[in-house]
């Protein structure tokens, strides 16, 4: 039977995955292994996406079209790239870039993480609640996908501050675009060692997101990311005294202008550090970076509030009333 128009695309592939597994070529091989004819896969990688995006000057080898081409080695079904051309110029050969990187092109996009200096005091979770034990909304993550379930946890409040350390993992979102929004939430579903991770690679607003087991570790991780101009950092220890891995992303807080091989090495180190910390997931990068994706069910966190994605509504941090009071 004739298949309907089909696009094969990628989303959220970290640099280490691209270097080791591939990009669209990997998707193509998966599709062929699943039973799709190679010529259908080729069309779904090229012509159909170009038409869908109204990029009518590309997507097919034809006179007058843009010469964005990939020369494949061997059989089509293997989708083994040998030479890559962009605009008619050879830019890659056998998996290696063959063009000279031009300096100075990203300067206008650097220095875009606009937050104050990060210290422990910024990770005090202050609330307008009386002393006692209160029920708070929490986010529960899982080891498979990006679904975050709404949950609850009881935590003590004393002097207007939630005593969360040694009781739960905490996630904080801090606006990094010059705003003053800060939101906290407990995070359930992970048995983590002492430490923290901070990142500005956090869809879709890419604010400064920090997850940790102590205020000191969270401050250390976030300070590392801010010093790098954006990126990802994983720290170990109750005070975050050891940086386990870091991936600077100073271009808009989400990109790097350095060679792919180096970025891939750093991404692999971050992935390994997250897994060693206890962040068990099929894709740790995706799991961490989508806690703020407020269009993905079910409970997400932004710099303005927690969001009930199904109801499309902001929700408060507390659930019901306090259970005890001093």
Describe each region flagged by the PLM.
Residues 2-4, 326:
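N-terminal intrinsically disordered, low-complexity, charge/repeat-rich segments that act as generic
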Residues 19-33, 39, 43-326:
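Active-site microenvironment of metallo-dependent hydrolases
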Residues 1, 8-9:
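Hydrophobic, small-residue-rich alpha-helical packing segments that form membrane-like cores
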Residues 11-15:
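Active-site beta-loop-alpha junctions enriched in small/polar residues
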């Amino acid at each position: 039977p004739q298949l309907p128009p089909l696009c094969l695309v990628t989303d959220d592939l970290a640099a280490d995955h691209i270097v080791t597994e591939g990009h669209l070529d990997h998707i193509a091989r998966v599709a062929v292994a699943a039973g799709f004819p190679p010529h259908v896969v080729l069309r779904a990688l090229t012509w159909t996406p170009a038409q869908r995006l109204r990029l009518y000057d590309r997507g097919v080898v034809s006179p007058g079209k843009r010469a964005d081409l990939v020369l494949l080695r061997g059989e089509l079904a293997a989708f083994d790239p040998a030479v890559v051309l962009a605009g008619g110029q050879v830019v890659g050969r056998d998996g290696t870039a063959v063009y000279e990187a031009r300096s100075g092109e990203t300067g206008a996009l650097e220095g875009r993480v606009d937050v104050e200096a990060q210290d422990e005091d910024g990770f005090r979770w202050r609330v307008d609640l009386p002393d006692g034990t209160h029920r708070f909304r929490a986010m529960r993550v899982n080891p498979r996908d990006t679904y975050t379930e709404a949950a609850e946890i009881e935590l003590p409040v004393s002097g207007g501050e939630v005593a969360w350390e040694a009781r739960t993992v905490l996630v904080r979102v801090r606006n990094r675009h010059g705003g003053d929004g800060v939101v906290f939430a407990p995070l359930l579903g992970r048995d983590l060692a002492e430490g923290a991770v901070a990142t500005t690679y956090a869809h879709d607003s890419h604010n400064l997101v920090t997850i940790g087991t102590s205020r000191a570790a969270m401050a250390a991780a976030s300070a590392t990311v801010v010093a790098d101009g954006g990126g990802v950092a994983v720290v170990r220890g109750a005070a975050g005294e050891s940086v386990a891995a870091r991936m600077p992303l100073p271009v808009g807080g989400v990109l790097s202008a350095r060679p792919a091989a180096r970025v891939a090495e750093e991404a692999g180190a971050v992935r390994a550090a997250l897994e060693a910390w206890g962040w068990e997931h099929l894709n740790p990068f995706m799991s961490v970076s989508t806690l703020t994706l407020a269009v993905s069910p079910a409970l997400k966190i932004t710099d303005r509030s927690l969001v009930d994605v199904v109801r499309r509504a902001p929700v408060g941090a507390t659930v019901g009333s306090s259970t005890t009071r001093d």
